[in-house]
């Protein structure tokens, strides 16, 4: 089972709001997911992001692959830097 961290679209028509979820890569975009680890609202200025960093780090350490958009969101919030530092400091 390949696990991805990706966006799940919520909200109404023309007013998107996203949940950052951990899901099996074979499940549909808005379908079944394993866990919610944050939210992303691109309509606010500046865009609003909330993350459960411990859960995100746990999933990344267990091999979950973030989508390109989620990788950018995590990078802007410093999570990817912490992940890489933790990963390479062990060696």
Curated annotation (Swiss-Prot):
- The UniProt record lists the keyword Ribosomal protein: yes
* Pfam families the record matches: Ribosomal_S16
Q: Could you tell me the Gene Ontology terms of the biological process aspect for this record? A: translation
Q: Which GO terms describe its molecular function?
A: structural constituent of ribosome
Q: What is the lineage of its organism?
A: Bacteria, Bacillati, Bacillota, Bacilli, Lactobacillales
Mind telling me which GO cellular component terms the entry cites? cytoplasm; small ribosomal subunit
Q: Which organism is it from?
A: Ligilactobacillus salivarius (strain UCC118) (Lactobacillus salivarius)
Q: Which family does it belong to?
A: Belongs to the bacterial ribosomal protein bS16 family.
Query: What protein does this entry describe?
Result: Small ribosomal subunit protein bS16
**Alphabetically ordered keywords of this record:** Ribonucleoprotein, Ribosomal protein
């Amino acid at each position: 089972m390949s696990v991805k961290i990706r966006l799940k679209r919520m909200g109404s028509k023309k007013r998107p709001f996203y949940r950052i979820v951990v899901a099996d890569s074979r499940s549909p975009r808005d379908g079944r997911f394993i866990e919610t680890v944050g939210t992303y609202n691109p309509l606010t200025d500046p865009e609003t992001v909330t993350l459960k960093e411990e859960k995100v780090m746990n999933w990344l350490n267990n091999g979950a692959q973030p989508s390109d958009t989620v990788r950018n969101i995590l990078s802007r919030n410093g999570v990817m830097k912490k992940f890489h530092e933790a990963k390479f400091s062990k060696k």
